[in-house]
Amino acid sequence: MAFLKKSLFLVLFLALVPLSICEAEKREEENEEKQEDDDESEKKRGVVTDLLNTAGGLLGNLVGSLSGGER
């Protein structure tokens, strides 16, 4: 009976070790994917900001030239 208990514990241990290793690798991959997503959204935010700044500058120049021409 003691032999069966030891065998069962050994089997459970050998099953849990690879499982925990797989979970750790999965967490690392998820963290890498999240970091990549954050980097991409940061780039998109930069592009949108640049577009808004350019559009604002163009509108400012247009309004300035229109109001300057009426005087």
Curated annotation (Swiss-Prot):
GO cellular component, one term: membrane
Signal peptide range in chain numbering: 1-22
Modified residues (Glycine amide): G68
Location of region: Disordered: 25-45
Organ and tissue specificity: Expressed by the skin glands.
InterPro entries the record matches: Frog_antimicrobial_propeptide, FSAP
Superkingdom classification of source: Eukaryota
Database matches in Pfam families: FSAP_sig_propep (PF03032)
GO BP annotation list: defense response; killing of cells of another organism
Composition bias type Acidic residues, residue spans: 30-40
Compartment annotation: Secreted; Target cell membrane
Propeptide: 23-42, 70-71
Outcome reported for the amino acid change (mutating N53K): PD36K; Gain in antimicrobial activity and no change in hemolysis potency. PD36KF; Gain in antimicrobial activity and small increase in hemolysis potency
Keyword annotations from UniProtKB, A to Z: Amidation, Amphibian defense peptide, Cleavage on pair of basic residues, Cytolysis, Hemolysis, Membrane, Secreted, Signal, Target cell membrane, Target membrane
Domain notes: Plasticins have huge conformational plasticity. They can display random coil, alpha-helical, beta-sheet or beta-harpin structures.
Family: Belongs to the frog skin active peptide (FSAP) family. Plasticin subfamily.
Stated role: Neutral peptide with no antimicrobial activity. Does not permeate bacterial membranes. May act in synergy with cationic peptides by enhancing their activity. Has a moderate hemolytic activity. It interacts with zwitterionic phospholipids (DMPC) without perturbing either the interface or inside of the bilayer, whereas it causes little perturbations at the interface peptide-anionic vesicles (DMPG) as well as in the bilayer alkyl chains.
Protein name: Plasticin-DA1
Source species of the chain: Agalychnis dacnicolor (Giant Mexican leaf frog)
